[in-house]
Amino acid sequence: MPASRPADFDAVMLAGGRAARMDGADKPALEVGGLPMMIRVAAAVAAAGAGRLIVVGPDRGGAVGPALAAVAAGLPGGLVTVRESPPGAGPVAALRRGLSEVRAPWLALLAADLPFLTGSWLRAVHAIAASSGRPGAVPVDDGGRQQWLASVWRAEPLRSALDVYTGGSLGGLLGPMEPARVAAGQAQEGSTPGLAPRGAPGGRPPELAPPWFDCDDPAELAAARARFEDGDT
């Protein structure tokens, strides 16, 4: 089965906002390496050649909203911002709302706090999913944990699964779909011609930072910032 072209996928970014473990801060807007994390995710989506970026979360004021729009301006389908109903209903509700805006046959499901995500890695996971014969592909970390919010899916099987799923867990929804598992290192950086190698605007993260590294608490945020500082040239 041939790999799909990168333009055949949209991206759904779950960017719900306030985080209890971050003292109520707007986590996606927190900066790592001089840029808000959600801007870094959007830049990776654009570099991967997505058709459109769908952000599920509140409208961002200040500098974040215009910066997000600027990054997505080059996408054929542009930027779409929506909210799950009711707001704060959880990741499955957010995915359901975001999926309703997907027009491509594939989608990337992404968190908004992935400062080390790159376009080349995202395209590599997409290629693995497309060639696997399965409904999607999910990276698996060294501890065997599936990283649902850095995964790629066929839109129609995901819609069908959502139609009958009544729970609130992403793992409960996505696990039974039996996606291809992408081991650490399997989706190699730079394996897709024509895309920039590892590195991101505002800093060059060191090689050991995995693309699915997220920042769920202050310690992880501090670790991400330190990695960017260590990698700056």
Describe the residue ranges of each PLM region:
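Nucleotide and nucleotide-moiety/phosphate-recognizing core
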Residues: 2-168, 172-211, 218-222, 229
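Cytosolic-facing loops and C-terminal tails of multi-pass membrane proteins
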Residues: 232-233
